[in-house]
Amino acid sequence: MVRRRKGRVIHGVILLDKPTGISSNDALQKVKRLYGAEKAGHTGALDPLATGMLPICLGEATKFSQFLLDSDKRYRVIAKLGERTDTSDSDGQVVQTRPVHVDYDTLLACIAKFRGETDQVPSMFSALKYQGRPLYEYARQGIEVPREARKITVYEIELHRFEGDEVEMEVHCSKGTYIRTIVDDLGEMLGCGAHVTMLRRVGVANYPYERMVTLEQLNALVEQAHRDEKAVADVLDPLLLPMDTAVEALPEVNVIPELMTLIQHGQAVQVSGAPSDGMVRITGGEQKLFLGVGEIDDNGKVAPKRLVVYGE
């Protein structure tokens, strides 16, 4: 018996500008429903408080979402000095209030200490799991559980504004970096406490900021399509970026048509000019059809790891 599909087959990446106040999964489900997509997944959750770039992979692009999850991120953040909360952001309860006696030079010096590789202990209010449950579930019950410090890298952290008790910064960091934790640590370093009042992700990997679209824009396009008696796909699909943009940081290996079939059947092949090791992005023929991702094996061959299945 042929399984009935629960959506249409559509492949690509849409850069959603997530609004504040909803979870990343809620945003994902709204986009999936608007596109009528059979399969969809996001590439790293944003806090409900946070806004900004949330790449959503549709169809076969979901196979490559991990590469975006592992990529560098950029954030704009506004912190309020003088108040520490139990969640390190304005969604939490204020647990400590202290006077703010911070000058510009001291603030700059403290911010500079976050640059480079450091060990960061994740917040209890995070989606990381302990014994199968998200940490925030324990935190809401007042239970603190052990968390291992993780290596993170802050490539750049810049002070954009310091007015009264507000500090605005931009942070370029590695995957797994908790901006709330940076702000909480900064507040303790300054001796006054701090928490996040605004957090916006402005970059994931090399995706262009200007290609982001909001849920309001998507809904408006769908409504206009209905009024004009057009197919929703005709107005929404042009917003999708090609699925190989999720892995564009990987070196490309182009295989001749004769080798494409072997690759698509999971066989490792020898390709002249391929790197000596590491992961690669595999394309085929003169058209450079994206075939998937492979890895250079011990014999120097390109071994396919995740392949695109085209068609229905």
Curated annotation (Swiss-Prot):
InterPro entries: PsdUridine_synth_cat_dom_sf, PsdUridine_synth_N, PUA-like_sf, PUA_sf, tRNA_psdUridine_synth_TruB, tRNA_sdUridine_synth_fam1_C, TruB_C. GO terms for biological process: mRNA pseudouridine synthesis; tRNA pseudouridine synthesis. It comes from the Bacteria. Its EC number is 5.4.99.25. It catalyses: uridine(55) in tRNA = pseudouridine(55) in tRNA. Transmembrane segments: none annotated. The active site is at 47 (nucleophile). The keyword tRNA processing applies. The keyword Isomerase applies. It is an enzyme of class 5 (isomerase). GO terms for molecular function: RNA binding; tRNA pseudouridine(55) synthase activity. Keywords: Isomerase, tRNA processing. Signal peptide: none annotated. Belongs to the pseudouridine synthase TruB family. Type 1 subfamily. Responsible for synthesis of pseudouridine from uracil-55 in the psi GC loop of transfer RNAs. This is tRNA pseudouridine synthase B. It comes from Vibrio cholerae serotype O1 (strain ATCC 39541 / Classical Ogawa 395 / O395). The gene is truB.
